[in-house]
Amino acid sequence: MKKFFLLMLFISMCGYNDSVEVINNETPTTTTTIGKNMNDKVYSNQPEMSIDLGKTYSALIKTNFGEMKIEFFTEDAPLTVNNFVSLARDGYYDNVIFHRVISGFMIQGGDPSGTGHGDYGKYPGYEFEDELNNQKPYEKGIMAMANRGPNTN
């Protein structure tokens, strides 16, 4: 787990049975429920760029422990933000659980298999290059993404 940015949540809160609402700076665009994924979606290609790089995007994750609002670093990681937003809009995260919860430290989610292994590369079916150069510190409350090594987002 060399690089972190989105999907794996490093947040001091923990939750289960959640929903994600992807929001740009004007209006909500989608709501996703997180639990056990029943749709088993796999994609053949990385999504086309569909976000507006001039807008600010965020996600609202609703859990039975409360809500978490996540702001994305669109300028720093446009491919990663586009990936998360596109997958959320398509329902990819519907019923996906937080498979790892460490109280007071972090939660991890986004793996449809519910194991954290991603069925060893099956999900979502494509990879893309790393974007961050670690300019942003990983402080308390930062959301991040794990991968299997360089350029395996």
PLM features: residue spans?
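Sec-dependent N-terminal signal peptides
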Residues: 4-12
